[in-house]
Amino acid sequence: MTPVTFYTKNNCPQCKGTKMLLESKKIEYTERNIDENEGYRLEAQATGFFNVPIIVPSPDSGIKSWSGFKPDELKKLI
């Protein structure tokens, strides 16, 4: 199973759906809320994505990062 960094923000339905799926599949994640931490917002911008949720798998996984609620991509992390 591949751990991920999960960029989110307050009141984001896609973020809530992604978090529920991560938890239901028992995928290890670190949540970084860009509304609550300026440093996390800058990190999220550095990914090149402009919309949350942003999922960044561990670098050694070989899985590319993505933005948005994508259940099929999340399944690759299992």
Model-flagged regions — what are they?
Residues 1-27:
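Local sequence-structure signature of Cys/Sec-based thiol-disulfide redox active-site neighborhoods
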Residues 7-8, 29-37:
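A short glycine-rich beta-strand->turn/loop micro-motif centered on a GG-aromatic cluster
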Residues 13, 38-39, 72:
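Short alpha-helical
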Residues 17-32, 49-52, 65:
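Conserved segment of the thioredoxin-like fold in thiol-based oxidoreductases
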Residues 33-50:
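Thioredoxin-like thiol-disulfide oxidoreductase module
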Residues 53-57:
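Cytosolic beta-strand hydrophobic patch enriched in CBS
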Residues 58-78:
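Non-catalytic, surface beta->alpha helical segment in thiol-disulfide oxidoreductase systems
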